[in-house]
Amino acid sequence: MHTTNSPFEFVRRLRGLAEIVSRNITRAGFALVLLPFSFLASAQTPDTGSIRGQILDPNGAAIVGANVSATNRLTGFHRQTTTNERGLYAITNLPLTGSYKVSVSFKGFAAKELDEVVLRASVTADINVTLAPDVTRTEVTVTGTSDAVKSDSAQLDVRLDAKKIEETPVFGRKTTNLVLPMSAIRSARGTGDLFLNNFLFIIDGGGRRQTNFIIDGGTGDDSWGRQTIFTNIPLSALQEFTVLTNSLSAQYGRSAGGAVNLVTKSGTNENHGDFVGLWRPPGLQARPPASTLNQRTPDQLAQLSGMFSGPIVKDHTHFLLAAEFNDQKRDSVITTKLAPGVFRGVYHQELLMGRLDHNLNDRNTLTARFNFDNFIDSNPQDAVGGNVLASAARNFRRRAYATQISETAVLSPSIVNEARFQVQFGSPITKFDPANPSTQFVRPGLSTEGESRQTKLTNHQYQISDTISFTRGKHSFRFGGDAIHSFSGGTGTEFGSAFVLGQFTFKTTGNSVNPGVSTTSLTIGDVASYQQSFGTMTYNIGEWLWAGFVQDDWKATRNLTLNLGLRYDRQTYTDDRNNFGPRFGFAYNLRGDGKSVVRGSYGIYYSEIKANTEASFTVNGPTGVFSYSATAGGTGFPKSLAPLPAFPAGAPLPARDITIRPGRATYYSQFFDITKLKGYPDKLLNPYTQLASVGVERELAPKWILNVDYVWQHTIGIDRTLDLNSPSLYIRTAGTPARSVAAANATRPITPVDNGYRRILSVVNNGESIYNAMQLNLNKRFSHDFSLLVSYTLSHTINSVEPDAPGGDPNDANQVGRFERGDSILDQRHRVAVSGWWNLPYHFTFGGLATLASARPFNITAGSDLNGDGANVDRPVVNASVIGRNAGRGNPLYDVSVFLEREFRVTERVRLSLRGESFNLFNHANTIGRNGVFGTGTTPLPTFNTTPGGVANVDPGRMFEFQGRLRF
């Protein structure tokens, strides 16, 4: 159940009121309640920008009926309106590709034109004009464009336009690496990620599955696992990449407040091409400085990408095609004395994207986009290496498609409607195939051979959304909603966990540990134990995610804008029905000149529960997969080194661990007495987050903008699994002996017996997280041949469980909450990111990205199950008490990446660029994973706080990439 502290009593009451309302309002009723607002609704959607302002005469009187138009220089897109009785106007939902010419005219006054007005996604530019009969007396004030202070919103974000995207070193040209210049972003490495095709990260104090991806206004999320973006976008197809870290308006939801907004390029009235060849040579890279190996492990990449766009019908229809092909070869070293060598993992990826923009008429535009993302990795996370032989390799596959169609209709000069429909297929969304399905053989300390764990999962999503924008007087209203239907599931859990062909573990003596004896020479007499999985391994889950919102950006005075919103989210997979999220923000233009803005905000945001949680309840539930295990001589023990054809008749099934869903007491009562469990929850709930911020934005000089903000984030009801059939509390002090498993089991509410259950886990919403930060961004827009972004965050994240990370068992299941309160494993007190570029003489460009971050914590464990509860996460006793959670600290993480580029003009329109990039230039030891096993004594083991091997634990050493680029 959700918990809250007394300072947040008003939140509890708000949710209680919402629950009463929700009991009496059906979905249709909810729509009817909000319907009157549909004629009062917005300014722009996430993939467009807007302009608004006031037209006055020299005496300050409003000019009624003045003509205002915006014309795109590249596409010919044109829209116009007239001012109302107060001289106010607004032109909304303007595409971002290219710049605009804004024209203002009225009979008897000199007309005024503004060239090169560049808009930002989801931002309204204020353009106020004072017209006069003499053009020299015309005055113009502009805020909210790409080069100006944002004065209409409290939203915190960092934006990269197409030029900044080009001039940022992006490792492997992966789109998700573009978040690195923002200091509020932290790497999520070490939290169970396997998606090496993308950079996984967190925003502020959230979890790695709590970031929303938005592509051209539609969802880019994968509701099945929420690991990363559903379909990657070729880098050359991006028009804008914006990270929204806080104070999001009501149109954003289903996350703890953070979002990544991607806007793709559209074609223009001229043909454009952009073709890139990239090569990462293995011979130039350094050995990772933290590696335990004495040799380099080459990581070779060849990439071809391209983009071609142009007109089909000038000023009316434009197209864009983009593609990217990757071929990566990464070696891992097999160190076992049994068969030392090198295993080459191969990674292939193909990205395709097509976009079509068509002006149906002067009031209606149509946009269609198609994406395809396909990859295969033959050695994910370098699983083969060390003592793991090539026969244990698995192929990791993913194939995703997305198609989106949107239509924008200008219903009147002040009302615009935008409708979208999207289809997303992940077929498979995740697939693990053993390279050679076979029984696994484990020779302790020597080798692991063979693999039979497999997974094949799919996800099909359909989204329909509609947003109506309406401007009336000083109000810019938005009303909208969307519905997503997701159907996912398949065979296995996310990474595969069942040895369907069995696993033999050999003895620790004799021939089993002799590297001179091949595994094929061993016999059943050398085996110490055996296990094999049986049972149901499939699951499917269908769910709806739907939402409605209303937002009013009210320009209360000429210098004060209030952002008022309300959002409702519903995820049918959970039991939460009162997810109302109010949003409030303000932006105050201090001096009225658009150069100093004070802003603040507060809002409530609900996180989505990933659909593959169902795998835990079905595959790991009472009727799911179970494992038979036996030692030599036991009932049913195999007579040869071959898997069993079926569960052995008459063999006992030892008490097993299961996971059950909240709110299903009647169903589970047929398996055990559920009333004996400790705090079985009656509902599966969505975690919710309170976000607040206050800060200032100041234009220090032309093109120099400084942002300083305090950010507070409090997440309540974090979902985590907990053993509700845990043994009694076992207090450990110095010298206290370990409790045996048998003694612990005797104290469980439901006593474990053969064919029964031991650990009975359920998802409970009792986790909490608090994040406090000061975020500073100094942005120098491009001028005088250089651009610069300095981003610094001072922060502290404390939680009682790590969101979206595996291994969430507490030290003792009877002591959670304040007993588990500690630093997040992703807590970094300081993080600095400095990025930019400088145009040098002779057509050279030099630039780079430097990131410096404090050390991350790691959890310290004893390495033994001291309380006998079946979870080997017990923390050691230090100074007469159990050490706190995540009490260890690693080493600081530094990375300096630079590039040097030279451009050659082949013809007037054709340019060739040659570029060299170096990543981790100084080969700093950036270790992610730490060995946290302290031991059970008073002094740590020799291996404590050392770095395990493998790419999951160490960032790459120094690497070089070279590019050739042809543009026209």
Where do the language-model regions lie?
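A short, solvent-exposed beta-strand micro-motif common in secreted/extracellular proteins
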Residues: 70, 98-107
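Gram-negative outer-membrane beta-barrel transporters
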Residues: 707-853
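Solvent-exposed loop/turn elements at secondary-structure boundaries
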Residues: 188, 529, 576, 587-764, ...
